[in-house]
Amino acid sequence: MTLEVVSDAAGRMRVKVDWVRCDSRRAVAVEEAVAKQNGVRVVHAYPRTGSVVVWYSPRRADRAAVLAAIKGAAHVAAELIPARAPHSAEIRNTDVLRMVIGGVALALLGVRRYVFARPPLLGTTGRTVATGVTIFTGYPFLRGALRSLRSGKAGTDALVSAATVASLILRENVVALTVLWLLNIGEYLQDLTLRRTRRAISELLRGNQDTAWVRLTDPSAGSDAATEIQVPIDTVQIGDEVVVHEHVAIPVDGEVVDGEAIVNQSAITGENLPVSVVVGTRVHAGSVVVRGRVVVRAHAVGNQTTIGRIISRVEEAQLDRAPIQTVGENFSRRFVPTSFIVSAIALLITGDVRRAMTMLLIACPCAVGLSTPTAISAAIGNGARRGILIKGGSHLEQAGRVDAIVFDKTGTLTVGRPVVTNIVAMHKDWEPEQVLAYAASSEIHSRHPLAEAVIRSTEERRISIPPHEECEVLVGLGMRTWADGRTLLLGSPSLLRAEKVRVSKKASEWVDKLRRQAETPLLLAVDGTLVGLISLRDEVRPEAAQVLTKLRANGIRRIVMLTGDHPEIAQVVADELGIDEWRAEVMPEDKLAAVRELQDDGYVVGMVGDGINDAPALAAADIGIAMGLAGTDVAVETADVALANDDLHRLLDVGDLGERAVDVIRQNYGMSIAVNAAGLLIGAGGALSPVLAAILHNASSVAVVANSSRLIRYRLDR
């Protein structure tokens, strides 16, 4: 790939890089690669023009190395490129130039008028220069007006452009220039505030680390010989062993293979309480080692880590439009023509062009247009910091309106980590260990919590699991497996009865007893004969009862628990949690039906689950919430909100954040519309000049952005 050095002088080099054009991700890769070179001060890659500008120290920087870094960025894997916008997106030199030129022109005009006592009206030369400066400073508004007129929809730029043209026709060059200069300052301040908002979100989610320590083992020197080397973080690969010391963020998702430490996972889970990690513990990128040292074998790097997926989701979510945003846009679209009409009426009645100009300027509904997107972006960033991944503004708004919640029991209201409590052989030729081993063989590929509990139990007892040739999932019932030439059935008593397997009286008594104790029985049949039984118990989450009480206090009118378990087990759990409405032995389609029934009754329904069988209900609910990013991928992808940890208190935070975001949006609408209305009344009375109108317009827009920015840290320290 060829590079063209367009210019290189005084420590500033501009390089033409065609493959960066229209590719912001590759532009980020270039910025990341070049920034690591010695002597490089700043680098900006511009996707619009396909150029890269590097500011460097001529004494320290190696020009050839910089160019090599640019070339190398073309081959960086996409998943290793940080999820951010290019630095060039934050810099708009022409905007600054417009403000500077406009300010200098106004200063010179002020000197001419008040120092040299020249008349206010400009001569031909002065007017020509002032008009040129006015057109230059007002170019973004004029361009926007032309675009909106071509599309047949007059926007706010049309109002500003109309006022500017009227000023120039009336030879009010100073007024036009002053107004445009003030509006440019206002636009710049809005952009600055929004950039700070985005930067704050990024800093909350993403550390500033750019290197990592990797442990290399030399096979020829023995297994114990190892060397630690420091490498760029984007060169770490899956399988590398990363060494993490105290007060350093873990840069990869993976498993601890050496050492132990106390780790703060708040960036991922929102939980401020540190946890202890030892060999075998899975850890996430973004977690910080508070005390100790660990070596982590990388399972995911870059954008594929949990924190990388969160950042990507947050950036995608900000593009999703909330219904309340459409309200603001409809208002803006209708208000612009109304503003022209009101301004024209004022001109006809008073004959005062300056008054009409003032009304055009004060009527610009820019602040209304900013009201929703700024608040949504800030709230989504806040949620991500708490470990709440909200996939769009529409879901955030819905979260504040939910008045009925459907819970899947296992893994949401219960811990989701059941333990084996009993293993009973029901056939003379079978021992309990055999029953457990063949049950584990049936469940070896399943991620259901009950299956994982059976597998864990065999590992704890050091029982080998026999291989199987084939398996079939019987959704909601159990598993059918073929192993050692035999057919195995593992599941509920209903499954065995459906398959014509006789369930003995002893087995039935065991089943009844276990269900009264809120334990789940799994029956194992081999070649049509019942051979054993395994029981499992899943504890209710300690915070579940308190959270349900608070949900009711917060306006949730109906809470429904769904479970595939037997009614007796469901009854025990429901009684413990104070739930009056529950359904047992439900299939995935039954969960979907339960959600739709509530919707038909007029409720705004939230569905909380964590498994594949919850996916249809999660998709159908007004807002689907997946518990824990460790849940099944299908559930996490289907849900509208994913909670990074399993703390039910986060459900309260979801509703609270949604309500707060809507409150802030309404405040923004109220503030901006009030300013527009008051400005129109004052302007119609002739008490407002075009310059004051521009100042008021800017103030309302900046106030809206600042008000929305408060959501970034709303109750983060609670």
UniProtKB/Swiss-Prot annotation:
The chain crosses the membrane at residues 87-105, 128-146, 154-168, 177-191, 327-351, 357-375, 661-680, 690-709. SUPFAM superfamilies: Calcium ATPase, transduction domain A, Calcium ATPase, transmembrane domain M, HAD-like. GO terms for molecular function: ATP binding; ATP hydrolysis activity; copper ion binding; P-type divalent copper transporter activity; P-type manganese transporter activity. It is a multi-pass membrane protein. Mg(2+) binds at D408, T410, D610. The active site is at D408 (4-aspartylphosphate intermediate). Its main location: membrane. Pfam families: E1-E2_ATPase, Hydrolase. Gene3D superfamilies: Calcium-transporting ATPase, cytoplasmic domain N (3.40.1110.10), Calcium-transporting ATPase, cytoplasmic transduction domain A (2.70.150.10), HAD superfamily/HAD-like (3.40.50.1000). Changing H697A: Loss of ATPase activity. Residues 11-78 form the HMA domain. One of its GO terms (cellular component) is plasma membrane. The keyword Manganese applies. InterPro entries: ATPase_P-typ_cyto_dom_N, ATPase_P-typ_P_site, ATPase_P-typ_TM_dom_sf, ATPase_P-typ_transduc_dom_A_sf, HAD-like_sf, HAD_sf, HMA_dom, P-typ_ATPase_IB. Keywords: ATP-binding, Cell membrane, Magnesium, Manganese, Membrane, Metal-binding, Nucleotide-binding, Translocase, Transmembrane, Transmembrane helix, Virulence. Induction: Induced by zinc and during infection of human macrophages. Transcriptionally regulated by iron. Belongs to the cation transport ATPase (P-type) (TC 3.A.3) family. Type IB subfamily. High affinity, slow turnover Mn(2+) transporting ATPase, which is required for virulence. Controls the Mn(2+) cytoplasmic quota and is involved in the uploading of Mn(2+) into secreted metalloproteins. Required for tolerance to Zn(2+) and oxidative stress. Plays a crucial role in the ability to resist zinc poisoning in human macrophages. Shows a preference for Mn(2+), but Zn(2+), Co(2+) and Cu(2+) can act as alternative substrates although at slower turnover rates. This is Manganese-exporting P-type ATPase.
